[in-house]
């Protein structure tokens, strides 16, 4: 199972690809999509769309997972982030991928063991759980953490379904 993790943002959208087989995780790739900050909002959203489409085309994931965003004190920033998140949810869904959504606290809990972990702790645990991973940025590490969270929750859901079917 190849999973695309996405950490949405209008300035930087982190992405990470992992392979999850049974209980084993393997880092495939990661990076950041950086729309041109000087471009109009609509153009930045197009650049975000095109960047995610390129990642999907290059790595052929089976499923996607997106981190839910928190509401910020600045309504204008929250609205723009929501628009970017809409693109981040739409692209994999339009590509036929099932999309899971996870709260940041659940992602941190799944990867670090506490929902209040710092970004540095998340990055360190991602590198521990994915040997050989050198996550390019904190945004990429966060996206990989979202993918890891999805793999863990997906595996649990499959085990429950098998147990109920017996």
Swiss-Prot record:
- What lineage is on file? Bacteria, Pseudomonadati, Pseudomonadota, Alphaproteobacteria, Rhodospirillales
Xref: InterPro entries: RNaseH-like_sf, RNaseH_sf, X-over_junc_endoDNase_Mg_BS, X-over_junc_endoDNase_RuvC
Q: Which CDD domains match?
A: RuvC
Q: Which UniProt keywords apply?
A: Cytoplasm, DNA damage, DNA recombination, DNA repair, DNA-binding, Endonuclease, Hydrolase, Magnesium, Metal-binding, Nuclease
Enumerate the active-site residues: 7, 67, 139
- Which cofactors does the annotated protein need, by name? Mg(2+)
| UniProt KW Ligase keyword | no
Compartments annotated for it: namely: Cytoplasm
GO CC, any one term: Holliday junction resolvase complex
The protein in question is named Crossover junction endodeoxyribonuclease RuvC
**NCBIfam families xref list:** ruvC
Comment on bound cofactor: Binds 2 Mg(2+) ion per subunit.
């Amino acid at each position: 199972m190849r999973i695309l993790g996405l950490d949405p943002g209008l300035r930087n959208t982190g992405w990470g690809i992992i392979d999850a087989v049974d209980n084993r995780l393997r880092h495939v790739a990661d990076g950041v999509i950086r729309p041109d900050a000087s471009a109009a909002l609509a153009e930045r959203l197009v650049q975000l769309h095109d960047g995610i489409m390129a990642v999907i085309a290059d790595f052929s994931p089976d499923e996607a997972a997106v981190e839910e965003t928190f509401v910020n004190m600045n309504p204008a920033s929250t609205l723009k982030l929501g628009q970017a998140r809409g693109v981040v949810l739409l692209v994999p869904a339009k590509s036929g991928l099932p999309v899971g959504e996870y709260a940041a606290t659940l992602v941190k809990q799944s990867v670090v063991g506490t929902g209040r972990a710092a970004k540095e702790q998340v990055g360190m645990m991602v590198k521990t759980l994915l040997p050989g991973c050198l996550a390019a940025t904190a945004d990429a590490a966060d996206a990989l953490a979202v993918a890891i969270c999805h793999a863990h929750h997906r595996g649990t859901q499959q085990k429950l379904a098998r147990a109920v079917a017996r």
